[in-house]
């Protein structure tokens, strides 16, 4: 029997202003070179811009965007008998949210624009509406999983 204890899963802390875990997850993913205060500034400016654009609660727009981008299934490369297959696997909610945040930031960074806050707010609003590069990435992942459905038994 293993002597290692079970590791309890860490819960994400909430940010100081909105008291929201998703905002803090976003801050931790946008963080570069340990500059957390700059990451908070970018997020809070983006949230203000969302408020100005949509005139609704920006946190609900953020939640809706992340829910829209969160994938249900993904593909994982699995080597079987000398050839590599893309095997579709189901994704849990925590991992799905992490992927959604990663894709949203990737799409925002790819956008042309003035600054990161503007690009992020535009991407979040688009994702909440059901368009944008992050949504396209999710649909592409789902298409890949559907195309490789025959390899699902390799799990």
Curated annotation (Swiss-Prot):
Where would one find coiled-coil regions in this protein? none
For this protein, the record's InterPro entries field holds:
Ribosomal_uS7 (IPR000235), Ribosomal_uS7_bac/org-type (IPR005717), Ribosomal_uS7_CS (IPR020606), Ribosomal_uS7_dom (IPR023798), Ribosomal_uS7_dom_sf (IPR036823)
**Where does the UniProt annotation locate this protein?**
Plastid, Chloroplast
User: What's in the GO CC field?
Assistant: chloroplast; small ribosomal subunit
Keyword rRNA-binding set for record: yes
Q: Which Gene3D superfamilies match?
A: Ribosomal protein S7 domain
Q: Does the keyword rRNA-binding apply?
A: yes
* Primary localisation category: plastid
Q: Name one GO biological process term.
A: translation
**Record-level Gene Ontology MF annotations:** rRNA binding; structural constituent of ribosome
What keywords does the record list, in alphabetical order?
Answer: Chloroplast, Plastid, Ribonucleoprotein, Ribosomal protein, RNA-binding, rRNA-binding
What does the similarity note say?
Answer: Belongs to the universal ribosomal protein uS7 family.
Function (record text)? One of the primary rRNA binding proteins, it binds directly to 16S rRNA where it nucleates assembly of the head domain of the 30S subunit.
> HAMAP family of this UniProt entry?
Ribosomal_uS7_B
What does the record note on quaternary structure? Part of the 30S ribosomal subunit.
Q: What is the name listed in the Swiss-Prot or TrEMBL entry for this protein?
A: Small ribosomal subunit protein uS7c
Native source organism of the sequence = Phytolacca americana (American pokeweed)
Chain's gene name? rps7
